[in-house]
UniProtKB/Swiss-Prot annotation:
Cofactor note: Binds 2 magnesium ions per subunit.
Binding site for Mg(2+) 2: 110, 113, 275
Protein name: Fructose-1,6-bisphosphatase class 1
Assembly: Homotetramer.
Lineage of producing organism: Bacteria, Pseudomonadati, Pseudomonadota, Gammaproteobacteria, Enterobacterales
Any matching Pfam family: FBPase_C
Family annotation (PANTHER family): FRUCTOSE-1,6-BISPHOSPHATASE-RELATED, SEDOHEPTULOSE-1,7-BISPHOSPHATASE, CHLOROPLASTIC
Listed EC numbers: 3.1.3.11
Cofactor: Mg(2+)
Residues the entry annotates as binding Mg(2+) 1: 89, 110, 112
Length: 333
């Protein structure tokens, strides 16, 4: 049995940014995940369910657990001294850590993805993305450090809190997954070098918004539902409503996750920095693909901290198919 800590140290030499600082940073995320796991598991017994009464910068109502997870991760990252600042879906602006001006890294995160599912005991997750800072060491970080394209990520990953708690991460040398053993208090290697299956037969999208989708996406959904033995269609529709949970299933089983732009969200709804980039990094490292329907997600230059994007990710051939439908069936302008 190999623990997450042992595995990280063992693999340090495999990637160009191998430093003890990054190892300690990942350990801080591991600690935050353990704390969140503990409190999610007693969510129905203590007063952390429901809304907080506050809204985030996007005007969305914040759940109590959103704020709890944000504070716990922020504290864990600041305490280690490797992170000079963070950006979070739950924070209006970047958070600069005072006294850590020599920290080499910045972290962007969605502390609790799918938190509205907590009240009904459905899986949720944490998403994180790590970059080397651009500004000089010894100075406070600025927004410039956070507005880097996804192809500059040093590491990324997620934690899924479900029937078991699993941490999945990449440093650019494959995707590895660790399952939490609560009796020992450690994450143990359970899936090494995870790869998408060559073909997939699941699609994940909120079909309740069908009327708002672009023509190409509507055509693709119909394609998924058609009978064709040669391509093993119709595909199976599976949608949880938590990006982490839907992506995790499709990663292991083969499939595609779709969150297109809509009439009400013409730029898409998912956040490029906190959701799309880290998941895209994982997807590509697992042999999959991630796109906004036209462009590679990791090549998009962000201009705003909370910038949104359409998002299609999963088995490479399936993402290629949806891109083709979007290209062949444009909306009437």
């Amino acid at each position: 049995m190999k623990t997450l800590g042992e595995f990280i140290v063992e693999k340090q030499h495999d990637f160009p940014h191998a430093t003890g600082e990054l190892t300690a940073l990942l350990s801080a995320i591991k600690l935050g995940a353990k704390i969140i796991h503990r409190d999610i598991n007693k969510a129905g017994l203590v007063d952390i369910l429901g809304t907080s009464g506050a809204e985030n910068v996007q005007g969305e109502v914040q759940m109590k657990l959103d704020l709890f997870a944000n504070e716990k991760l922020k504290a864990a990252l600041k305490a280690r001294g490797q992170v000079a600042g963070i950006a979070s879906e739950e924070e209006d602006e970047i958070v600069v850590f005072e006294g850590v001006e020599n920290g080499k890294y910045v972290v962007l995160m969605d502390p609790l993805d799918g938190s509205s599912n907590i009240d009904v005991n459905v899986s949720v997750g944490t998403i994180f993305s790590i970059y080397r800072r651009i500004t000089p060491l010894g100075t406070p970080v600025t927004k410039e450090d956070f507005l880097q394209p996804g192809n500059k990520q040093v590491a990324a990953g997620y934690v899924v809190y479900g029937s078991s708690t699993m941490l999945v991460y990449t440093t650019g040398c494959g995707v590895h997954a660790f399952t939490y053993d609560p009796s020992l208090g450690v994450f143990c290697l359970s899936h090494e070098s995870v790869r998408f299956p060559a073909t997939g037969q699941m699609y994940s999208i909120n079909e309740g918004n069908y009327i708002k989708f672009p023509n190409g996406v509507k055509k693709y959904i119909k394609y998924c539902q058609e009978m064709d033995e040669a391509t093993h269609r119709p595909y199976t529709s599976r949608y949880i409503g938590s990006l982490v949970s839907d992506f995790h299933r499709n990663l292991l089983k083969g499939g595609i996750y779709l969150y297109p732009s809509t009439a009400t969200h013409p730029n898409g709804k998912l956040r490029l920095a906190y959701e799309c980039n880290p998941i895209a990094f994982l997807a590509e490292q697992a042999g999959g693909k991630a796109s906004d329907g036209k462009n590679r997600i990791l090549d998009i230059q962000p201009h705003e901290l909370h910038q949104r994007s359409a998002f299609f990710t999963g088995t490479e051939s399936m993402v290629n198919d949806v891109e083709r439908f979007i290209r062949d069936y444009p909306d009437n302008v």
